[in-house]
Amino acid sequence: MFEIKARDAMGRLGVITINGKKIETPTIMPVIHPNPKKQTVSMDLINKMADVVITNSYITYTTPELREIAETKGIHELIDFKNVVVTDSGSFQLSVYGDVNVGPMEIIDFQEKIGVDVGTILDIPTGPDVSREKAESDLLETFKRAEDSIKRRKEMGYKLALNGTIQGSKYLDLRQKSADVMGKMDFDIYPIGAVVPLMEDYRYREVAEVILNSKMHLPTNKPVHLFGCGHPMLFALSVALGCDLFDSAAYALYAKNGRYLTADGTLHLEDMKDLKNFPCTCKVCSEYTPKQLFNLEEKEKTRLLAEHNLYVTFEEIDRIKNAIKEGNLWELVEERCRSHPKLLNGLRVISKYMDFIEKHDPVSKKSGFFYTGYESMNRPEIYRHKQRLERIQYDKIYVTTVSENTSKPYHENLDNVPCDVDVLIKDSVFGLVPLNIDTMYPLAQNEVPDLYDFEKKYNNEFVSNFMEKNSEKILDISTYNYYINHYGTKKECDKINPDVFRVGKMLEYQYGAKILDDELMEKVKTRRSKNTGRIRNLLLEKEVLFTLRANDNFLIPAKSGAELLHEKLEFPKYRIVIDSSVEEYARAGKSVYSKFVKDCDPELRPFEEVLIVNSDDELLAYGTTILNGLELMEFDYGVAATLRGGLKK
C-alpha cells in the first residue's frame, strides 16, 4: 500500500506499508551482503539509518550455509535486520555471467520460504547496447516469467510482495511496452532495470528518458524503484522524475577503492590526505582528519569510508525530502545537475516531456520560483502558466513592455487606467503576464537574476504566436491610448470596478471558466486587507465567496463560493465524485480517502481547489486535492483530498 503525503515536481514524499512495516519515500535501500562476514558496515548502524534494505536471494540460495540459516531462521535473522527486507532474484548475476543455477519459479518459492518482505521475479536484464531483436526477445521472456510469478504467488497463497521489473534496453518504445504490460499485472513495486551500464557511462540523458518513458505507462499508485542507482548526485533528478526507491552498494564498493562520496560527485581519499579537514561533518569526518583516515589499516579504513559514504547518501535523501516539503525540489535538481555536464544533459532532455511532468507538479508551493539558469525556462510552472493564459476570456488586449527595474507585482508599480482592456506585460521568463492576475503564483512569487540577451529572447516566439492567435483583439498603442482617454474623459471608468474586474480574471485563470457573469459583477464587492492594502475577499451581500490566500493569491472558496463554482462549472470540472457510503463524512468536513473516489475531473492537478459531489452531482463539500486526476482514479489507499468544509443536508 502506498500513500502520498507531500509532493513536488514528480517527487513523492510518501509511505509504503508492507507486512505492517512502514517505509518513508523517497529512500535508499543499502545493499546488504547475505554473508555477515562480508558486510562492510555494521548492521547496528544500518538498523538505525534504514527503513528497508536489499540483499541477494540468489547468493543465499546457492551458498549452503547461508541457505540453511535462511530457511530455518528467516532472512531477517540471517542479515540481522528487523524492518523491510527486499531481495534480488539473481538477475544481476544473470546480466554479468549470462546464466544462473535457479529457475524462475524456484527463486519465487525460495524468497517466500525465507520470509522476504518484497521479492523480485527472475527477469532478463537487457543492457543498452544489444540489438533490438535481442531486446524484444528478452522482454517477451520477462513477460512470461512475470505472468508465471504472479500466478504462482496467487495459487500458492504466498504473502510476499513482488517487484515487477521494467526492461527494454535503450529502446524507449520497448520501455513503454514493458510498463504497459507489467503495469497490468498485480505487482507491488516497479523497478526500472538495466540502467547501471548507462549510469556507469554517464549516459544520463538516456537514463532520464528511460525513467520517463517507463513512468508514463506505469500505474501511478505503485512505487517505482530505480535499480542500481546508488550515487547521491543522481537522486534529486531521479526523484523529480518520479522514482521513489533506490538501492546502493556504492557506499561499500566505492570505499574499497578509496573513493569518498559527496552529494555532487566523487573524491579520492588519497587526493584529500593533505587537507586539514573533510568537507563533511558526519561522525567519521568529524572524528578523523583525511590523513588519519588514509593511514589507517586497510580494513578499518574501508569500513569507516563506507560509513561516511552511507551517511552522505542518507543525508542527500533527507535533503530531497525536505525540498519536497518546502516546494523547492526543482531548485535542488538544477543545482545537482550542474555538478556534471552529462547530468545537465539529463535535465535538459526532460523539457520534451513537460506536458506529462506538469500534470504531476503542484499548482502552488510554499517556496517561490527561483530562476537558477536557462533550464529554469522549461519548468512546469512556466509551462502551465502559458497554457492557462488561454483560459482567460479576453475582449480587448494591449501588449506592452516595462522597465527591467519595475518591481513585481507589476500592477502596483504602474499608472494603469481602470478599464476593460486586458493589459499584458512581456516578461522574459513567463512570456506574458496579465496585470489582472500578476499577484498569483508564480508570477509575483519569483526571484530572477539579470538575464543575458539570449535568455531575454527565449519567449519571443511564444509572444508572437499569442499575438497572432489573438490578432483581432490586440490594440496597438494609438488605439489603446484613445480607448483609455475615452474612458477617462467620459468617466466610463466609474462603470468598471477594477478590483472586481481583476478578481473575475483571476477566477478565469484559476478555474478555466467565467465565474462572474455581468449580473454578478455588479453585485459583488471586494474587501482589502487593512495591513497590506491588497484585495483579501470577494463578497456577495456581505457574505464571503472567496478569500485570496496571502502566499499565492489563489482564490479559496468559502461555502457560498463553492456553491457558485458548482453552479458555473460544467460537470466534471473541478469535481471529485465519491461513493454514497461516505457522503455523511464529506458533509461533516472529513477527509476524502482514495478508495471511495468513483470519478473525477481528469485534468485536476495536485493541490487544486475541488468540489466533492455524489453521483448525482450534488455538492457535498469542498477542499483541496492531494492527487491529480489520474491518481485519483488509480490510488486505493490514503487521503485523496483534505476538506475545508461540508454542506449539511
Swiss-Prot record:
GO BP annotations, alphabetical order: tRNA wobble guanine modification
Residues annotated as domain PUA: 573-648
Biological pathway: tRNA modification; archaeosine-tRNA biosynthesis
EC code(s) of this entry: 2.4.2.48
UniProt catalytic activity: guanosine(15) in tRNA + 7-cyano-7-deazaguanine = 7-cyano-7-carbaguanosine(15) in tRNA + guanine
Signal peptide start and end residues: none
Domain of life, per lineage: Archaea
Enzyme class: transferase
Active-site annotation: D88
PROSITE patterns in UniProt: PUA
UniProt feature coiled coil, ranges: none
Binding note for cofactor: Binds 1 zinc ion per subunit.
Binding site for substrate: D123, A194
Keyword Transmembrane helix among UniProt keywords: no
Gene Ontology MF: a single term: zinc ion binding
Pfam families for the chain: PUA, TGT, TGT_C2
UniProt-annotated binding residues for Zn(2+): C280, C282, C285
Keyword Zinc-finger: no
GO cellular component, one term: cytoplasm
Functional summary from the UniProt entry: Exchanges the guanine residue with 7-cyano-7-deazaguanine (preQ0) at position 15 in the dihydrouridine loop (D-loop) of archaeal tRNAs.
Family: Belongs to the archaeosine tRNA-ribosyltransferase family.
Protein name: tRNA-guanine(15) transglycosylase
Source species: Methanococcus maripaludis (strain C6 / ATCC BAA-1332)
Lineage: Archaea, Methanobacteriati, Methanobacteriota, Methanomada group, Methanococci
